[in-house]
Amino acid sequence: MQDEALDIFDEKQNPLGVAGKAQAHRLGLWHYAFHCWLYRVVDAGTDVRLLFQQRGPDKALYPGLFDISAAGHYRAGEAVADGVREIEEELGVEIQFGDLVELGTRAEVFEAGNIISREFCRTFLGRTALDPAAFRPAEPEVTALVEVPVADGLAMCAGTWPTARCSGVRHWAGRWRQYESELSLRDLVPRPAAYYLDIFRHVEQASGGLRERADEPPGQ
C-alpha cells in the first residue's frame, strides 16, 4: 500500500513541504488533521447525544479506545473542506462541509512506540439525524459506534460522575450488534478531561441547551 503524502509544517504552522505519513510519524513532523464530532438531538432539551467511535484493534495509536466521531489526516494539497471525506470513509455517510460548525484548531502530540504524531487538528461539530445503527462503519478500522448522553458526559468530564452511559452498535462475531455499556475517561483516547468537557458544552449550546440534568450516575 502506497504511503499517504502529507503537507508538513513547523510548530508555527509555516509550510515546509511534503512527506509520507510514515516518515511524518517517525520524525514527529507537524501536519494537519480533520476532527469532526457528530451529535444527535433525540428530544430537544432533554436527550442530546454525542457520537464516539471505538478504534480498531490494529490501530498503531490507542487501539480499542473511544475517540472522535470521525477523524483523519489531510492529504497533501487538500483544502480545509476536503476533510469531510473522512466522515464518509469511516462512517459510510456523506455530510456537507457547509453543515459543520468550526470549533477551532488544536495542537495535539501523541507518542507510542516508534510513532510521534504531531498534529494541528481542525475541529468541527455537526448534527446528524442518524442513530449509530444507521451508519456504515469501516470495520476493522472502527469496531463500535456509541452515543453518550450530553448530560452524562458533562457530569463525567466535570468529575461529578465516574462514568457515563453509552449505547450503539459494536462489531462482534462477524456482524454489528446492539451494544450498551458505560464509559469512563480511561476508555477515551487520552486527552485532558477539559477537552472533552468543552466538546460536550459545545454540543449542549449548539442543541439549544438542556432543561434538566440527570441527578444519579449510571448504576445507581
Whereabouts are the PLM-identified features?
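Short, solvent-exposed loop/turn segments that connect beta-strands within catalytic domains
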Residues: 41-48, 113
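Conserved Nudix-box catalytic region and its N-terminal flanking loop in Nudix hydrolases
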Residues: 23-35, 46-90, 160
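A short coil-to-beta-strand element that immediately follows conserved catalytic motifs
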Residues: 94-104
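Residues that flank catalytic or metal-binding motifs in active/ligand-binding sites
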Residues: 4, 32-34, 70, 102, ...
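Acidic, metal-coordinating catalytic segment for phosphate/diphosphate chemistry
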Residues: 1-44
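Nudix hydrolase/Nudix homology domain
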Residues: 104-111, 115-220
